Amino acid sequence: MKKLLILGCLLASFAGFAQNEESLKEAELNRFKVMVAKDLPGLQAVLHKDLVYFHSSGVQDNKDSYIASVASGKSSYVAITPEEMQQRVYGKTGINTGILSILQQAADGSQTTIRLRFTDVFVYADK
């Protein structure tokens, strides 16, 4: 079984993850789905123990603090929509780049949409 680390914006793990562009894209889209669903067990499963996650604000989280922020509602995503995505795979390293439109919800229920560029670096490693 393989574990996938995403550095830069994220570290995550995906079992049986093939090292090609299409599966790299699927892994990224699955991560977005789990984040929007506030699926804490799903986040626990897909995020690597060495997660480094940088928010658009510059705030940095590790795995535990990121999952806690989702659980508390501090990080609350209503929708994550890729506008552009490009995948590159170099041996055991995969890079996703692109532009996202993210609909966020604040604790008071107000919603804002942010548009941002992202880079996620995936490194394939044994589990």
Give residue spans per PLM region.
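A beta-strand edge to alpha-helix "cap/lid" segment located at domain peripheries
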Residues: 4-7, 19-45, 50-127
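N-terminal signal peptide c-region/cleavage motif recognized by signal peptidases
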Residues: 13-15
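Acidic/polar active-site rim loop that often engages polyanionic ligands
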Residues: 10
